[in-house]
Amino acid sequence: VPPTAPPVRSSPADDALRKLSALIEDGALATGTLLPSERQLAERWSLSRVVVREAARKLEQRGLVTIRHGIGVEVTNNPALPVQHTLERLLPSDQERLRQCAQARLLIEPELAAAAAVRATPKGLRALKANCAALAAETDLARSAALDIAFHDAIADLAGNKVLAVMLRSVAQLGRLSREVTLQRFGVARAHGYHVRILAALAAADPAAARKAMKLHLEAALGDLA
């Protein structure tokens, strides 16, 4: 009988990291709120403040919080943020960044739309419909771009692939400027029309139609950057 390996003991920092991650991911600490102070967390869990500080740094590396010196640790719950920062360093040129982001979306999103057509729930479809209605009525450029991004993020979530959803969110935030340029040049009506066609394909549970509608939408977006 082979010897049994001794159990791996987690460090106090890992324990604190697990507890804080659970509070954020379970929704007990909402996005935009501040974590309890280092002292409060250290007393609550009988840990040193150094251990709590290290756990906060690891949370920031994962995109779950942002450390704001002099203010506290703010919950951001954005796992895409570290990837986004890496891409910003790799692609310092705004124009090249926008072009490559649009190309990446064209490769990723049609398949996400096809998967979402199979997995979409009535609740998810209602949320997309509400988003379309809000976009049609919106007149502010920045809010229109935010609604556009939210529509695509929601489809990625419906597709059920967390890896691709995080990748898409990273790319979407980097390419936000291209959305604002497109909305400014063509108005909301064009984007809204594409979204309505995508939503119709999702509601019909038609993966091929959803893939095609998304592909046409993103080909137009890529063409806008030419």
Predicted regions and their residues:
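Short helix-capping and inter-helix turn/linker motifs at the boundaries of alpha-helical repeat units
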Residues: S11, A142, F186-R190
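Short linear motifs at protein or domain termini
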Residues: V1-L107, A114
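Short amphipathic alpha-helical interaction/hinge segments
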Residues: V83, G175, R179-L183, L222-A226
